[in-house]
Regions:
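Beta-strand-rich interaction surfaces with strong enrichment in secreted/lumenal proteins
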Residues: 26, 105-108
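Short, well-structured beta-strand
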Residues: 52-82, 87-91, 110-174
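Post-signal peptide N-terminal segment of mature Sec-exported envelope proteins
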Residues: 27-50
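N-terminal secretory signal peptides that target proteins for export/translocation
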Residues: 1-4
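Bacterial signal peptide processing site
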Residues: 19-23
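A short, amphipathic edge element
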Residues: 95-104
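Bacterial N-terminal signal peptides
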Residues: 8-18
Length: 174
């Protein structure tokens, strides 16, 4: 019996040292527009209207020192959104509104080719990384916040997928 434990122990140590991580819960948007992977526990707020836009939020508060958020914004029916305009100046406006120090502000494209703005901020020991992604008439905000050791933010950003661009909704609600 001891002979069998040796290889199992070696395999276990090898897996632990190679960084195998448990999977995060997978969230699929009810309308099929996006999917995301966030650490548990997840809290989902149903889509709601705020002014001229509709918001859907998914968040994770693994512990009091870190949080992850995915928020989808799209216009109410009959309105249009300029996604590129939303990306322009996002980092500066976000920092100015909250008195945060900008540590990163970069425009580029995600692996899927979608336009994105990436920002990082610091304020009173709080670290924040945000990626804003344009997808048709939707704009997604991916936010990671933490104090102390950094969580796996790249895993969070890479686990987000736009599955379908949001189309223009021409029919205003009655």
């Amino acid at each position: 019996m001891a002979e069998r434990r040796g290889p199992a122990l070696v395999l276990g140590l090898l897996l632990a040292m190679c960084g195998c991580k448990p999977g995060w819960p997978h969230f699929d948007a009810p309308d099929g527009t996006f999917s995301a992977e966030l650490p548990p526990p997840l809290r989902v707020e149903a889509e709601r209207i705020e002014g001229s836009q509709r918001l859907l939020s998914v968040e994770s508060h693994g512990n009091e020192d870190q949080a992850f958020l995915v928020q989808r914004r799209r216009p109410v029916p009959g309105r249009r959104l300029d996604p590129t305009g939303v990306l322009d100046g996002f980092c500066a406006e976000f920092a100015r509104a909250r008195s945060y120090e900008i540590t990163t502000d970069a425009r580029g494209r995600r692996r899927d080719g979608r336009a994105a703005q990436t920002c990082a901020f610091r304020a009173q020991g709080l670290e924040i990384r945000i990626q804003v992604v344009a997808a048709g008439q939707c704009v997604y905000t991916l936010m990671a916040m933490w104090r102390g050791p950094a969580p796996d933010v790249d895993r969070f950003f890479d686990g987000f997928r736009v599955l379908e661009d949001c189309p223009v909704d021409q029919n205003p609600s009655p």
